């Protein structure tokens, strides 16, 4: 199975979700000067920022990570977290990334996610990779 790549702010909500998920994952560094490059296809798990529009919805660190053409080329799908208090903007980073990168928006969950979210993502990620061609 290919990997998960995620970003978590200092609130650590996404980090806690990843820990509960119990699947191999690589973290995009919080420090903007640190860079990572992936070597296999991955699903991105990302929090949504801001309270409304698309501007600012995607964390800067994630934008920098995806601006690396090599990293962007290996992106296969996106899962977003958010806060339902923001209405239509809930999980907006997933929508923005999916649209701009031409990949499916696979799931969204609120804050740290529920046990049901953990189970849905675990099952969904496994099934997603099983449907992908071997060299994708």
Curated annotation (Swiss-Prot):
Give the GO biological process terms. protein modification process
Q: Which domain of life is it from?
A: Bacteria
Looking up InterPro entries in the UniProt record yields: Flavoprotein-like_sf (IPR029039), RNR_Ib_NrdI_bac (IPR020852), RNR_NrdI (IPR004465)
Which Gene3D superfamilies does the entry mention? 3.40.50.360
Q: Where are the transmembrane segments?
A: none
What GO MF annotations does this protein's record show?
A: FMN binding
Cross-referenced NCBIfam families: nrdI
The record's similarity note reads: Belongs to the NrdI family.
Q: Report the protein's function.
A: Probably involved in ribonucleotide reductase function.
Q: What is this protein called?
A: Protein NrdI
User: What species is this protein from?
Assistant: Shigella boydii serotype 4 (strain Sb227)
């Amino acid at each position: 199975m290919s990997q998960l790549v995620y970003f978590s702010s200092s609130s650590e909500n996404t980090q806690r979700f990843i820990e509960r998920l119990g699947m191999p994952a690589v973290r995009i560094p919080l420090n903007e000067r640190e860079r990572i490059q992936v070597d296999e296809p991955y699903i991105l798990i990302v929090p949504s920022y801001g309270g409304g529009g698309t501007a600012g919805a995607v964390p800067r660190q994630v934008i920098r990570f995806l601006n690396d053409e090599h990293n962007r080329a290996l992106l296969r799908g996106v899962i977003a977290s958010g806060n339902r208090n923001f209405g239509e903007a809930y999980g907006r980073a997933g929508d923005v990334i999916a649209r701009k990168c031409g990949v499916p928006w696979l799931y969204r969950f609120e804050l740290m996610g529920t046990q049901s979210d953990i189970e849905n993502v675990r099952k969904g990620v496994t099934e997603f990779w099983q449907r992908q061609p071997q060299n994708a």
